[in-house]
Amino acid sequence: MEKASMIYEGKGKKLYNTSHPDQVVAEFKDDLTAFNAEKKGNEAGKGALNCQISTEIFKLLEAEGIKTHFIKQLDEKNMLCKRVSIIPIEVVTRNIATGSLSKRLGIKEGSVLPFSLVEFYYKDDALGDPIMNDEHAILLKCVNSQEELEFLKETAREINEILRSFFDSKGLNLVDFKLEFGKDIEGNILLADEISPDSCRFWDKKTNEKLDKDRFRQDLGNVKMAYEEVLRRILN
């Protein structure tokens, strides 16, 4: 599938039109960003790793009945996807307290939550992607109804159950992760974006070593090695 004009460039990917009106190509970038792009870096090979990791996870989820925008991986950095209109909500699911949750509510980092917590954030870089509730989402017309919000929550929880079990079998704790959804031309809500160490936190079950973008956020080093380790475990 040939790329045509670029539609959009985000922090981690570029999106391109194709000859098919309902399909786009997502090119995964080597760029690293943190703290709403206040911190920037680059890691050669990171884009290819995220593309392959996302491919494997989308395949897993599709096999479990989750509808996604994924069609196929084209090459090491490019993925063919269904065209969707992104819903401006970041759906964050948390299993272990860390990051902004610990800072915001004073929950000790590393505390296992008694239930999986699903949060909504308004997808707006200029505002810093603020946390919001259901009524905010409807007020801002992010969705058409409360039913659509419930679908996002239920799907996030279903994905969480699938991925927690999968990564547990690989010796990894799925600490938390961010999902994005979009609507296809028929109005169906599909899982979109990516699922990778850029959008998930993975901790080694034995050592609690961080194997995700926190290595960049916190200047821990060995970012590429961490992403490679996640991919190795997924494939083994």
From Swiss-Prot:
PROSITE patterns: SAICAR_SYNTHETASE_1, SAICAR_SYNTHETASE_2. GO terms for biological process: 'de novo' IMP biosynthetic process; cobalamin biosynthetic process. The keyword Lipid metabolism does not apply. CDD domains: SAICAR_synt_PurC. InterPro entries: SAICAR_synt/ADE2_N (IPR028923), SAICAR_synt_PurC (IPR033934), SAICAR_synth (IPR001636), SAICAR_synthetase (IPR050089), SAICAR_synthetase_CS (IPR018236). Belongs to the SAICAR synthetase family. Pathway: Purine metabolism; IMP biosynthesis via de novo pathway; 5-amino-1-(5-phospho-D-ribosyl)imidazole-4-carboxamide from 5-amino-1-(5-phospho-D-ribosyl)imidazole-4-carboxylate: step 1/2. It is an enzyme of class 6 (ligase). It catalyses: 5-amino-1-(5-phospho-D-ribosyl)imidazole-4-carboxylate + L-aspartate + ATP = (2S)-2-[5-amino-1-(5-phospho-beta-D-ribosyl)imidazole-4-carboxamido]succinate + ADP + phosphate + 2 H(+). SUPFAM superfamilies: SAICAR synthase-like. Keywords: ATP-binding, Ligase, Nucleotide-binding, Purine biosynthesis. It comes from Wolinella succinogenes (strain ATCC 29543 / DSM 1740 / CCUG 13145 / JCM 31913 / LMG 7466 / NCTC 11488 / FDC 602W). The gene is purC. Its EC number is 6.3.2.6. The keyword Ubl conjugation does not apply. NCBIfam families: purC (TIGR00081). It comes from the Bacteria. This is Phosphoribosylaminoimidazole-succinocarboxamide synthase. GO terms for molecular function: ATP binding; phosphoribosylaminoimidazolesuccinocarboxamide synthase activity.
